[in-house]
A protein has these predicted regions:
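Structural motif
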Residues: 38-46, 96-105, 143-149, 181-187
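Short loop/turn segments immediately following beta-strands, especially the blade-tip
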Residues: 47-57, 108-112, 188
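Blade-level signature of beta-propeller repeat domains, shared across WD40, Kelch, NHL, RCC1
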Residues: 170-188
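C-terminal amphipathic alpha-helical segment
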Residues: 62-116
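Conserved blade-ending motifs and adjacent loop-strand segments that build the rim/top face
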Residues: 65-72, 116-133, 153-172
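Beta-strand C-termini and the immediately following turn/loop, strongest in propeller blades
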Residues: 32-37, 85-97, 139-144, 177-182
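Blade-terminus and WD-like Trp-Asp/Gly-His loop motifs, strongest in beta-propeller folds
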Residues: 21-28, 78-86, 130-136, 167-172
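Surface-exposed loop and turn segments in beta-propeller and other repeat-based domains
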Residues: 1-15, 56-73
C-alpha cells in the first residue's frame, strides 16, 4: 500500500466513518457498515484488490466504491453478503417514520443509473438481527434463536429456538453459537 503523502488534500474532504467490515465470499470486495455526519447510515462496497494494490482512498472515493441506499439515523444493523453480487441489509422503511423487520437485497454489480446507488432487487419482511446467507438461504439470528428464509420466495422455512449463531462458515455450511464459553455448531 503506498504511504500517505504529506500535502495530499483529498483526506481533508472526507467525512465517512467506517463501521463493521464484511468480506465477500470470493474475498475480492468489502461491505462496510459506515456512516456520515448527521448521522446517516451509509453502507458501501469497494474492491479490496484496488484498495490494497495502490489506492489508499478506494474505500472513500475510489472508482470501485458503490454506495448502498442510506438511511438517516440507522446503521449498525444486520448486513451480509448473499453471494458475490448481492448484499442483504436489515430494515424496511424509514427510521424517521417506522422501520419493520425485514431485509432489502441489493445487486452491487448494477448501479441504479438515476441515483448511482446499488440497485434494490428484492425485499421481504421478517428477518432481523445478525444475518448470514449461502446464496439460496438467508439466516437471521436474534435472542430467541435462528430463523431460516428462502431468498427467492421471501418466506420463512425453518426455525431453531435457543440457537443464536454469531459466526458462519460458508465453506463447510455451518453456523456457530459461541455463548456461555462453549461452541455449538449446526450444519445445514
Amino acid at each position: 500500500m503506498p504511504p500517505f503523502v504529506a500535502g495530499d488534500e483529498q483526506h481533508k474532504k472526507l467525512d465517512y466513518f467506517h463501521g463493521a467490515l464484511f468480506l465477500s465470499p470470493d474475498g475480492n470486495q468489502l461491505l462496510n457498515d459506515g456512516w456520515n455526519w448527521e448521522p446517516v447510515g451509509r453502507p458501501v462496497v469497494w474492491s479490496l484488490l484496488e484498495w490494497v494494490r495502490g489506492n489508499v482512498w478506494e474505500s472513500e472515493s475510489g472508482r470501485s466504491r458503490l454506495t448502498i441506499p442510506h438511511q438517516n439515523h440507522y446503521w449498525n444493523q444486520g448486513f451480509c453478503w448473499v453471494d458475490n453480487r448481492h448484499v442483504a441489509v436489515e430494515g424496511i422503511g424509514h427510521p424517521d417514520d417506522e422501520m419493520i423487520a425485514g431485509v432489502r437485497i441489493f445487486d452491487i454489480t448494477r448501479p441504479n443509473q438515476e441515483t448511482e446507488f446499488a440497485r434494490e432487487v428484492n425485499v421481504f419482511a421478517g428477518p432481523s438481527g445478525r444475518l448470514f446467507a449461502d446464496g439460496d438461504q438467508l439466516f437471521s439470528a436474534d435472542d430467541q434463536g435462528l430463523s431460516i428464509w428462502s431468498i427467492s420466495q421471501g418466506a420463512l422455512t425453518g426455525r431453531i429456538s435457543g440457537f443464536s449463531p454469531t459466526a458462519h462458515s460458508l465453506l463447510d455450511r455451518t453456523l456457530m453459537d459461541t455463548k456461555g464459553g462453549t461452541v455449538r455448531r449446526w450444519a445445514y
